[in-house]
Amino acid sequence: MAYTKLIVAAAALAAMGSVSAADESAALPPAFVWKPVPGLVWKTVGSARIENGLLIAELDKVGDAYAQAEIDLSAYDRKPYEIAATVRAENIVDARQAYLGYRFAVNYLDMSMGGNRTWPSGRRIVGDYGPGETHFIDRTEKVRRKAFIQVGICSARGRVTCDLSTLRIREAQPLVPKRNVGYKVKYPGRVKNLPRMRGVMLGNVKGDAWDNLQAWGANLVRYQFAILGTGPVTNFEAYAEGFRANTMKELDNITATLDAAKAHGMMVVLDAHYACGGSCSKELGDPIDWSGDWRVFHDKRFAKLFAWSWQKIAERCKGRTDVVYGYDLMNEAHHTSPAAEGCDLVGLQEKIARAIRMIDPDTPIIVESMYCDPGWFRSLSAIGLDNVIYQVHLYYPHDYTHQGILTSASDVYCWPDPKMGWDKDFLLKSLKPVIDFQKEHEAKMFVGEFSAIAWAPNAEGYIRDCIRIFEELGWDWTYHAYREFPGWSVEHEATSRGKGTENFRPSKDNPRKRVLLSGLRGELAPGGVTGKGRGR
């Protein structure tokens, strides 16, 4: 009887996830047609078991139960790929982190990043799903070796079944069509002739913050602001009403920031740090393939509302090019599923930029790649407008910069690390897609964020190497962050590894602070230019 149930369950799962290979083959280039993944040797972890090709992972207490197999991804070197299978998830609960719980994902050694193991996040599922098709999509362009696929439950409880015979793979289709190839960005003399801009990222700082930054030698700040709606996003009108009201309130904060910066000889990047409508999730009724994507890329109502808020900011800031460095449209924006028509990463940024230009034709617009990640510059398109600055964030290697935050506090990574291949040259190679983009489009580049957590061994050396590279490349930059989380603050030292405030103490002088101040004064530029951060 149990055997019969398993066969019926497997057949039901396969039927639910079936695709018409003939139809797909006729409609798609060969690279984008699904292919089977033969020869996988599965090993089970915990109580997971495989019976007649059906994986069964079931836990009534939080734990691990999954199957794992090594998978050869060499055919997808520097290409995005996706893997699919037919699964059913039931009552997945008690996952402590978004990346835990239901597991359908791949991890691998990233040979393009020194060989460190990388764990791209799969789709998050809580509660019930299916039976139906599930996807893991890795849209990065990396060299992947020693890859393992995992299916089941990780640090949660519930039940997952997967028909392993339905597992298939293909090259992932481009999310954002390439456009404006070879477009050369032009800049007015006012922007081209700015001195090298160096500074920090901050929020609504108070007290002696501005005097302090001026004494440090900063001439640029990246001001992060958050405009949110009220009520659930599922009630758009209520959310939009609150969002509009909060936009009008934020205008006064922006004005105060610009006035303070001008009084202290600085310029301001206006950074819309959080997305209108937040992120999509299954719990909010969104399709599971949208999970984690910014809502503005899938729902045109929120995209239009976001553009409206930027127009209001432009109305307030028009004519202040002496203090506004640029309108930073999005912060680490991303979507891993196809966007609504005209609302993909590049398309939406261009629409917002054009909406701003109707009001303020003079202030630079700041545009970014997916996640603001260097690797995504390989597929980034210029938006076809002049006076646009392109932004990148640098947290490579992430295992080093964020050790103890997204990884165990006991995992210690060093800088440099010859065994891992991590050094200044590694950082420069990581930025090659950005450098290539800059050359193709003759674009002005801005590094909006870079840092290393306070307890990282030789964090000051990492910060020094970053700044020297930016200076050699002629890029403006802002350090993450000023008077925010103590772990990034150079006015604090870590007494132990941990995110709690008890793990830090105030510090008037420390190696990280000395390096940052040296950078702000221009002393890390080629030739060691000095003088209030205004050196070229």
Predicted regions and their residues:
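Bacterial N-terminal signal peptides that target proteins for export
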Residues: M1-I7
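Bacterial N-terminal signal peptides
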Residues: I7-A15
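Short beta-strand segments enriched in hydrophobic/aromatic residues
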Residues: A85-A89, V106-Y108, T140, I153-S155, ...
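Aromatic-rich peripheral "rim/lid" segments of glycoside hydrolase catalytic domains that contact
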Residues: P177-G182, P457-R536
